[in-house]
Each structure stands twice: as C-alpha cells, then as structure tokens.
Swiss-Prot record:
This is Phosphomethylpyrimidine synthase. It catalyses: 5-amino-1-(5-phospho-beta-D-ribosyl)imidazole + S-adenosyl-L-methionine = 4-amino-2-methyl-5-(phosphooxymethyl)pyrimidine + CO + 5'-deoxyadenosine + formate + L-methionine + 3 H(+). One of its GO terms (biological process) is thiamine diphosphate biosynthetic process. Catalyzes the synthesis of the hydroxymethylpyrimidine phosphate (HMP-P) moiety of thiamine from aminoimidazole ribotide (AIR) in a radical S-adenosyl-L-methionine (SAM)-dependent reaction. The gene is thiC. It comes from the Bacteria. It comes from Acidovorax ebreus (strain TPSY) (Diaphorobacter sp. (strain TPSY)). It is an enzyme of class 4 (lyase). NCBIfam families: PRK09284.1 (NF006763), PRK13352.1 (NF009895), thiC (TIGR00190).
Length: 614
C-alpha cells in the first residue's frame, strides 16, 4: 500500500464526531468568518457548547483529502490586505529531507507523494510588515482578531442557567492573580492585547488553513502537543495521524519536533493538514544538514532553514538565542546539566568556537525573516532545569533576563513573541518563576513545559507535571506544553499523546476556573447536575474523554438499563449518597406539603385558637 493510502486509512479512524456532538459555527461580521464550536446534545434537551480544536476532521459535512490538504480559512483575508507577494521560493534540496543524492528513488517518491501539497510561498512586499502585532499597533482589527474574540467567548447562552445564583457566583469567584480578564472578549480587546505584546496570534501568511487562536494571560489557557519522527522510530503517516489525534482531544497548538529523515516532507503533510498553529525548533533540521555535528553549524545554514520552514507555513519557531557563552559555566554544578536539546546544541557550538551563539548575534536578522512571514518567536529556555534540585538557579534566570531583552528587540520589529519556561520546579518554587517572568519579560506570554513538581514518577510524569501546570497556569502562564507518560522514557505513541493531552486539558481548565475566566465553570456545573440527576450518558459526553468514562462505567454495569439506574457499582443501590439526598429532599418536600395542607385546613390564619388546631 502506498503512503497516501495509509494516510487515508488512518485518518478514517479519527473523523467520527464526539458522542452526541455536532459541529456548528459562529458567524463573524464578514463572509467566510465562521468560528467552530462543538455542541453537546443532552438527554434533557439542553445543548452545551464547548471550545473546539479538532478542525474540520469532526465535521462529517466536510470532505478531506490529506493528499491535497485542508481548505483555506484565511487566504482571502491575507490577499485583501494587499501587503504580500507570491514568489518562486527557495530551491528544494535533497538535504532538506536528509537525503544525499538529488536523483535518489526515495527522494523522488517523497516528492511525488507530496506534490499536491505544494503552495506558492508568500512574503511581505518590500517595506511591508505583515505581522498581527504590526496591524494591532496601527489600530487595525484584523479578521484574525475578530475570529479569536468569537472563539474565546463561544456560545454562552446555555451558561446562564448555571450562573443565575448571584450569591453562589460571588462565593466561587476566581482569583485572577493580576490578570485582566473582561467578561466579554471583544475584537478591540484582542487587538489591544496583541499590540501590548501580552498575547500572540500565531498565523504565518503561508498557513492559510489555520483557525486563528490567541495565546495570552488574559485568554483561556492553551495547551501544546509535541509530535515528530526520530532517527530510530516513526513515519510520516504516523505523525499526521498523531496531529489529527492530538487536536481531536484538545491540543491548541502542535510542535513538529522531527529529527530523523524526511523532515521537510513530514512538515509538508503536517502543515497543510493542520487547522492549528504549527511550531518547530529549526536548529534540529539545521543540525541534520551538517550531519549532526553541532560545531559545523553556521548562520547561513540556519538562515536558509528558517526561510525554508517559513515558506512552508510554520507559525512559530523555538529559537534558543538566550544561551550565551558566559552562562554555560553556570550549569557546571547542576545535577543534570543542560537538558534542552536546542540548548545543548548551541552550548556545544559556543564552547567549540568560544564566541557568542549566532542565534544571539544575528537576532535582528532573524527578526527580519520573522516579520516577512508573520512567524512568531517562541524564545527557547535552553538552560531550563532538568530536575527539581536545579530549579530557579542562576543559569535559568540569567537566560530568562536575556530573553526579556530579546523580547524588546523583537517588539521593535513588531514580531510576536512568547517565552518558554521550565521544566522541573517543586511546587513551592513555581510562583517565583511566574513573578520573575512577568517582571523581566514585560508580560510577554509564558509557555511552560509542565513544570514537573517531582522527579520520582517515570511512567506517570504527565500527572507529576499536570500538577505544576495547573498551578502555573493559574498564576499567569498562557500555554502549557504537554508531557506524556513516556516523558524521559521514549517517543510517545497514539495513546500516550491522548493521555498527555487529557492531563493537560484538566490542568488548563482548572487554571481557567481558578482565574475566574467567564463561564469556565459552567461545563462543570452541567456535568454535576447530570451526575445528580443520574443522566449517565450526559455525564460521559460532557467529560473531556467520553469514551474512557463510558468504558470504566461499563466494566461493571454494561447493560443499557444501567445507564438510567440511580446508582453505580461503587456504592450500589442502597448506599448512593446522591440517591439518598434526593430521597431526603423528597421527604422534606412532603413534610412541607403536609404543613401547607394543615395550614389551609385550619382556615389559612397565622394564629389559631388551640381548640381549632386540635
């Protein structure tokens, strides 16, 4: 079977809608601006609408051919601005895919399979700047900003019944810890946040298929999933399947961290079929081009790689420009040294040449490339701690201060920027990370890997890190990079990806509730009510993972009759606290009814003679 057929068969597995769910769209102010939401139909007639990241893959009305890629969402908006131009683009090389011979059979096969995915690249016209930050600073509200506003608000009508009790809402009000979250997100609010640098909308002009989203402290906490092949395992079709699988379960962004063969072609398939922003670490591919020898890296090779990936449509680059020569010695006393792949590559280059990294010395040149395509910076934390005992040390914070300086340079060029953070941090040290980042990086969005709160959980690091992720998300982190059960152990498979995403959706949602994001708790209330009403199917379907919830329930009570029973296998029919509570309420109601009847029987008077009452 050829590769495209493999893609088609794999994607068929993950195109079905969620149980009891349909895709609907919120209409914007102009034709073509349609924001997806997922509507969950409840058995009591209610409809609960939730934020949706799955793109057209869960919409049966949309025809998808992965050989050709998704339909354009933003193409007309980009063209209407009149500040871009199409051009021939750089010449594709065998080395881009890790191949040595330009006329090899494998290379010809790869290119043939991806032929329909090729697009003419766009770039900014001479003298133009096409970043969302540039438009925002000029006071322009773009369609992307309106899209974000509609997406953040969602369809809120259904929430009102759960938010009518003013006393309860006051008691449960969140603590935003300094965030400024309005009750309604307006397009103007989005514009202002992007202009200030407090939010980014990752949306390369060469990725028109992307459904715009925002990463920022004053928006919903987002999560990122990592995929990518390696030198020892995985294939192109597996990575596309992981992409579709990841966004199905809630990944807001996906990073392609491929380090093996066929990097360029893998990225073609991923970007063209992705409705979410795609990020990369360009130094990985640059290293492949020099045979894996860090010392042989040059600015020219790296620059060529940036342009290659920008032309393909990558939305944000992780660039470890904060790893400076003077900081490397600060890691010498660490228990685990430098654990970032990109950080260790650049540290080795700096030591071999005994000079500052070309990522640092050419930073403004990099900005010129970024603003020509609207690629956002994800300034990498190459010196992040790799274990709890290395957290918050001098090396980590020295790099963070440099990232703050680089942020201001990027903003001078109107390049959207977010800051990457740790890593491994004990719970009691997390707040210091957030405080330091807000202060030194001028409120640019923070994007953290966890952090893992302990180091003794191999196989369960998704749990150890989700604890830290929930905390730092509440404190102000804008996006959480997921951790899977395979962290530190191996490359995650399909099931690992799902487990990592669900763990991080829990963390992100917990942070939104704690911050008091408008309406964040309504879905919890809807599920709680379904639980109290013994609407089992609604409980399953309102959860983050309906399939697993139903599977666990059916392990002991598989019959359809159990889906309407007023008990589960944990307590049984006689010890269910919620059933008992309902009976108590019924008894209380009967008692009140009895007293009312007695009141009416005695003439409806407040004070009655004793003989009449008798």
């Amino acid at each position: 079977m050829n590769a495209p057929d493999k893609f088609a068969s794999l994607l068929a597995l993950t195109r079905e809608p969620f149980p009891a769910s349909t895709k609907s769209y919120l209409a914007g102010s102009q034709p073509g601006l349609r924001v997806p939401v997922r509507d969950i139909q409840l058995t009591n007639g209610e409809v609960v609408s939730v934020y949706d990241t799955s793109g057209p893959y869960t919409d049966p009305a949309v025809q998808i051919d992965v050989r050709k890629g998704l339909a354009s969402v933003r193409g007309e908006w980009i063209a209407a601005r009149g500040d871009t131009e199409g051009y021939e683009g750089r010449v594709r090389k065998a080395l881009d895919d890790g191949q040595k011979a330009e006329d090899g059979d494998r290379l010809a096969q790869l290119r043939a399979e991806a032929a329909a995915l090729q697009r003419q690249p766009l770039r900014a016209r001479s003298g133009a700047n096409v970043t969302q930050m540039h438009y925002a600073k000029k006071g322009i509200v773009t369609p992307e900003m309106e899209y974000v506003a509609l997406r953040e608000n969602g369809r809120r009508e259904w929430m009102q019944q759960y938010m009518q009790d003013a006393a309860r809402e006051q008691r449960l009000a969140g603590n935003p810890l300094g965030a400024s979250i309005p009750k309604i997100i307006t397009p103007e609010f989005v514009r202002d946040e992007v202009a200030r640098g407090r939010a980014i909308i990752p949306a390369n002009i060469n990725h028109p298929e992307v459904e715009p989203m925002a990463i920022g402290r004053n928006f919903k906490v987002k999560i990122n999933a990592n995929i990518g092949n390696s030198a020892v395992t995985s294939s192109i079709e597996e990575e596309v399947e992981k992409l579709v699988w990841a966004i199905r379960w809630g990944a807001d962004n996906v990073m392609d961290l491929s380090t093996g063969k066929n990097i360029h072609t893998t990225r073609d398939w991923i970007v063209r079929n992705s409705p979410v922003p795609i990020g990369t670490v360009p130094i990985y591919q640059a290293l492949e081009k020099v045979g894996g020898i860090a010392e042989d890296l040059t600015w020219e090779i790296f620059r060529d790689t940036l342009i290659e990936q920008a032309e393909q449509g990558v939305d944000y680059f992780t660039i470890h420009a904060g790893v400076r020569l003077a900081y490397i010695q600060l890691t010498a006393a660490r228990r685990t040294g430098i654990v970032s792949r990109g950080g260790s590559i650049m540290a080795k280059w700096c030591m071999a040449h005994h000079k500052e990294s070309f990522l640092y010395t050419h930073f403004e040149d990099i900005c010129d490339i970024m603003k020509a395509y609207d690629v956002a910076f994800s300034l990498g934390d190459g010196l992040r701690p790799g274990c709890a005992s290395d957290a918050n040390d001098e090396a980590q914070f020295a790099e963070l201060h440099t990232l703050g300086e680089l942020t201001q340079i990027a903003w001078k060029h109107d390049v959207q920027t977010m800051i990457e953070g740790p890593g491994h941090v004990p719970m009691h040290m997390i707040q210091a990370n957030m405080t330091e980042q807000l202060k030194t990086c001028h409120e640019a969005p923070f994007y953290t890997l966890g952090p893992l709160t302990i180091d003794i959980a191999p196989g369960y690091d998704h749990i150890a890190s989700a604890i830290g992720a929930a905390m730092i998300g509440w404190m102000g982190t804008a996006m959480l990079c997921y951790v899977t059960p395979k962290e530190h152990l191996g490359l995650p498979d399909r099931d690992d990806v799902k487990q990592g995403i669900i763990a991080y959706k829990i963390a992100a949602h917990a942070a939104d509730v704690a911050k008091g994001h408008p309406g964040a708790r309504a879905r919890d209330d809807a599920l709680s009510q379904a639980r109290f009403d013994f609407r089992w199917q609604d409980q399953f379907n309102l959860g983050l993972d309906p399939d697993t919830a139903k599977e666990y329930h059916d392990e002991t009570l598989p019959k359809d009759s159990a889906k309407v029973a007023h008990f589960c296998s944990m307590c049984g029919p006689k010890f269910c606290s919620m059933k008992i509570t309902q009976e108590v309420r019924e008894f209380a109601q009967q008692g009140l009814q009895s007293k009312a009847e007695e009141f009416n029987r005695t003439g409806g008077e407040l004070y009655v003679p004793i003989h009449r009452a008798d």
